[in-house]
């Protein structure tokens, strides 16, 4: 037995630790513990190590590891730690970092000149930095260090002054754009998925893979307010897939990984009471309303939702499971599934966008597994068209003031360098752009007015390439270190239909 343990540990250190953490607690990749692998069967884990995983861009190791070695590593992933790390309120409070001294007053006027609503925050994952970019002149204002492995996209305060970052290893950071400096940081978890900022600017919600919690923070200084354990009525806990702000509903939405539920968490003090059980008549006292701030409304479903998308009203969410064959449409008004949606392959709903097509609102979503973009009528929830593309893609973006939608094929080995421009009026591709032939091109974002589109060359020696959104000609190119995403202040805080929220 002893001779078995040592080589397995060395295999993990050599092939896995750089992404999944030295103690299997997560890093760029998720934590590899039995508590976090509840839905994954061992034979499926073997296949993932051998062949890779499309959705997470994890490579396969069939050429580097033998069948026996893959089996060894699988066994390690399912082996419990002597003690599962805890991250409780005292730990969160103890991690707090205040970058603004007590009594220090930050200026309410920006220390630079630019259109404050046409700024971009560009995340450069190559060396863990971010660049604040002037969206009129396409000139960097400041490049600054971030925490390790940011994930989920930065989120802005409602006025666009502050940007909040979330990292894979649990850190939440608040940065003052006006003063070009960090305000505060705190570690909300050990392995975190993403964060959301409330529409009133008062709260930040962090969703964790490890521990299985949601953490509510005060947006002003990131002080912890509440930890919400994530578990069903039977006590089964779950990782959090993602958290979102449903601004028109003044609530947070949490997608859960291991239990078939979606949670709605109101942050409005005037919200209607939430009754956990079945209530026929509240006067009879059949159920008591959940007490305290941030009550949980559980929406129970037939299947898991790993990935989902909201309509512009935030009355419906469209979700899909990674191993499912169809999507589900869930009404947040009535709290249940109201329709099934035909979504073959592996749709990436988190990158879906909407627009008006011949008088009908439509949803378009790329696919991580197939070279298709699915276009769905959002009145009937029927598929209008499957647009054939050059290969599986991750991101799709547009803007209200452009007739085009831009889609990458970054999951395709043969076409990873291509961006396809699709006419929203005809649902047909009209142009293919290759910002850097042979290098990965991904993640388009538009300027505030929709006149320019910014595309990432997603490599260590990468670049941000600016295109005229009408002529599709290159305007400018800025060298950057693997710019994974760029986020326009105005488009984000106004919840543009052409970008993710």
Residue ranges of predicted features:
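Predominantly soluble domains enriched in secretory-pathway, periplasmic, or organellar proteins
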Residues: 1-6, 22, 45-51, 65, ...
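Short metal-coordination and nucleic-acid-contact micro-motifs, chiefly zinc-binding Cys/His arrays
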Residues: 12
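The −1 position to Zn-ligating cysteines in a subset of zinc-ribbon hairpins
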Residues: 15
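Extracytoplasmic electron-transfer domains, predominantly the class I c-type cytochrome c fold
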Residues: 18, 23-27, 32-82
């Amino acid at each position: 037995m002893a001779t078995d343990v040592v080589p397995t540990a060395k295999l993990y250190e050599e092939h896995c630790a750089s992404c999944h953490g030295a103690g299997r607690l997560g890093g760029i990749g998720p934590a590899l513990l039995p508590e976090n692998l509840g839905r994954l069967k061992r034979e499926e884990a073997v296949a993932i190590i051998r062949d890779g995983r499309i959705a997470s861009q994890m490579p396969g190791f069939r050429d580097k590891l033998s069948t026996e070695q893959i089996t060894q590593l699988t066994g390690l992933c399912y082996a419990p730690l002597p003690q599962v790390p805890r991250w409780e309120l005292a730990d969160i409070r103890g991690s707090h970092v205040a970058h603004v001294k007590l009594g220090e007053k930050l200026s309410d006027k920006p220390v630079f000149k630019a259109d404050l609503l046409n700024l971009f925050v560009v995340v450069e994952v190559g060396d863990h930095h971010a660049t604040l970019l002037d969206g009129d002149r396409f000139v960097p204002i400041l490049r600054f260090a971030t925490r390790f492995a940011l994930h989920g996209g930065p989120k802005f305060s409602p006025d666009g002054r502050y940007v909040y970052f979330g990292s894979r290893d649990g850190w939440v950071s608040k940065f003052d754009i006006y003063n070009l400096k960090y305000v505060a940081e705190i570690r909300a978890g050990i392995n975190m998925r993403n964060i959301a900022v409330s529409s009133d600017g008062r709260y930040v919600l962090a969703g964790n893979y490890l521990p299985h919690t949601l953490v509510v923070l005060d947006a002003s200084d990131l002080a912890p307010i509440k930890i919400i354990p994530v578990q069903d009525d039977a006590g089964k806990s779950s990782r959090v897939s993602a958290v979102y702000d449903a601004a028109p509903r003044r609530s947070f939405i949490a997608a859960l990984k291991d239990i078939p539920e979606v949670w709605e968490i109101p942050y409005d003090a005037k919200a209607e009471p939430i009754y956990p059980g079945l209530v026929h008549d509240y006067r009879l006292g059949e159920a008591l309303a959940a007490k305290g701030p941030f009550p949980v409304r559980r929406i129970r479903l037939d299947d898991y939702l790993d990935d989902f998308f909201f309509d512009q009203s935030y009355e419906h969410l469209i979700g899909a499971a990674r191993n499912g064959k169809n999507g589900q449409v869930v009404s947040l008004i009535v709290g249940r599934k109201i329709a099934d949606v035909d979504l073959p392959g592996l749709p990436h709903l988190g990158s879906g966008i909407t627009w008006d097509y011949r008088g009908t609102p439509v949803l378009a979503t790329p696919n991580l597994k197939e070279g298709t973009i699915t276009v769905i009528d959002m009145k009937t929830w029927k598929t209008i068209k499957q647009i054939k593309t050059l290969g599986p893609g991750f991101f799709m973006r547009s803007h209200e003031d452009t007739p085009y939608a831009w889609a990458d094929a970054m999951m395709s080995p043969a076409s990873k360098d291509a961006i396809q421009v699709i006419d929203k009026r005809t649902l047909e591709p009209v142009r293919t752009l290759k910002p850097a032939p042979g290098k990965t091109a991904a993640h388009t974002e538009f300027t505030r007015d929709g006149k320019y589109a910014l595309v990432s060359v997603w490599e260590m020696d990468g670049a941000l390439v600016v295109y005229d959104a009408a002529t599709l000609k290159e305007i400018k190119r800025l060298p950057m270190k693997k710019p994974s995403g760029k986020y326009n202040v105005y488009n984000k805080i106004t919840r543009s239909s052409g970008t993710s929220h």
